[in-house]
């Protein structure tokens, strides 16, 4: 392990033994001294060319660490970040969280919140209007959020939204059935063994 004040240079080749007695060897891609975490780029375990495994190692749990080859060149520059794309992603995440918070504060049922999330995965243009879900400004789903509660302009958009709502509740019922079956099975086993 690196001693006090010692660091692993990015690009250096390192070898070490894990607590499971596995010998690892790879290129250092990151090292955090305070947490003693080392990230190694190793040949792909799948054997695919042009692929690599990135392993995160806690140096408290490895032994026989040795630097095989120090990096002699300066490391390549860091990849540039697309700030516009990152800002857009952050804005969308914030809007989603605010939408969830609004639904909770408005007293929307859990079924309504789950349906909104299901619709939002497929159609981003959906929002809350009090306790109603408004989709593409063409369909409105009011509590208790069933297919018969879908209203709007007749057409493909409303039909599509109704299909999403119907499938959502079928999937929810199937999930509940799967969760109930193990409990029912154990009850049957208990009653037959009595």
Curated annotation (Swiss-Prot):
Domain of life: Eukaryota
GO CC, one annotated term: cytoplasm
Region (Disordered): 173-194
PROSITE patterns from the UniProt entry: AD, SM
Sm domain boundaries: 1-71
Annotated AD domain residues: 79-173
UniProt-recorded Gene Ontology molecular function terms: RNA binding
Subcellular location: Cytoplasm
Keywords: Cytoplasm
Summary of the function given for this chain in its UniProt record: Nicotinic acid adenine dinucleotide phosphate (NAADP) binding protein.
Family classification: Belongs to the LSM12 family.
Protein name (database record): Protein LSM12
Organism name: Xenopus tropicalis (Western clawed frog)
Lineage: Eukaryota, Metazoa, Chordata, Craniata, Vertebrata
Gene designation per UniProt: lsm12
């Amino acid at each position: 392990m690196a001693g006090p004040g010692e660091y692993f240079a990015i690009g250096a080749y390192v070898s070490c033994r894990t607590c499971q007695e596995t010998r690892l060897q790879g290129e250092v891609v990151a090292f955090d001294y305070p947490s003693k975490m080392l990230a190694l780029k190793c040949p792909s375990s799948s054997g695919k060319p042009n692929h690599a495994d990135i392993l995160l190692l806690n140096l408290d749990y490895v032994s026989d660490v040795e630097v095989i080859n120090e990096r002699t060149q300066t490391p390549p520059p860091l990849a540039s970040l697309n700030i516009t794309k990152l800002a857009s992603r952050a804005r969308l995440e914030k809007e989603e969280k605010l939408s969830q918070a609004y639904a909770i504060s408005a007293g929307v049922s859990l079924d309504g919140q789950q349906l909104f999330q299901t619709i939002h995965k497929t159609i981003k243009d959906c929002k809350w209007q009090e306790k109603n879900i408004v989709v593409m400004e063409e369909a409105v789903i009011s509590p208790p959020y069933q297919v018969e509660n879908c209203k709007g302009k007749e057409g493909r958009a409303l039909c599509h939204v109704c299909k999403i709502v119907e499938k959502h509740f079928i999937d929810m019922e199937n999930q509940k059935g799967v969760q109930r079956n193990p409990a029912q099975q154990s009850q049957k086993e208990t009653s037959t063994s009595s």
